[in-house]
Amino acid sequence: NGEHGVWQYKVDLALPCATQNELDIEDAKMLVANGVTSVTEGANMPTTLEATKYLQENGVLFVGGKAANAGGVATSALEMSQNSERLSWTFEEVDGKLKGIMETIYANISDAAKRYNMTVGGNTDYVAGANIAGFEKVVDAMLAQVFANPKHLAGATSSNQLDIRL
């Protein structure tokens, strides 16, 4: 913050993975000036909102931590599943399951962003896609719970049938 640290170097891809707000607007400006093409968060909110907007508006492909950082949570869930079933998976089995989960996350956020034409700086807005996909998942779970009283649904059986406006 302020001194740029690792963000001062010319790179194609930047991966902020440490502390919250570690990549600020000045760092973002330096990355853009040095030609960065993509920033992918590997932690919870390591990029300030101002820096995120600057990167996106300047054509940098930005993938936020909601999606990109989901691997840690997914692996924890796999470990809990493995432990509850008293199983012992190999590294390759866990890695394969995690790969499938991450591919599904990417497909979901990419699809959501495309369905709502969410782009910024000429790139797919994966931050918006992750927010939309997460919202739809919550809506679908809520709808599943409401089937006991369908008059609240107005005919919708999934989030895809609701009129969601952004």
Regions found by a protein language model. Give the residues of each.
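Adenosine-phosphate binding glycine-rich loop
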Residues: C17, M30-A154
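Metal-centered catalytic cores of metalloenzymes
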Residues: H4-Y9, A28-V36, N44, L162-I164
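A structured beta-alpha segment of the ubiquitous adenosine-cofactor-binding alpha/beta core
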Residues: N1-D27
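N-terminal low-complexity segments that are often proline-rich with Ser/Thr-Pro
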Residues: L153-L166
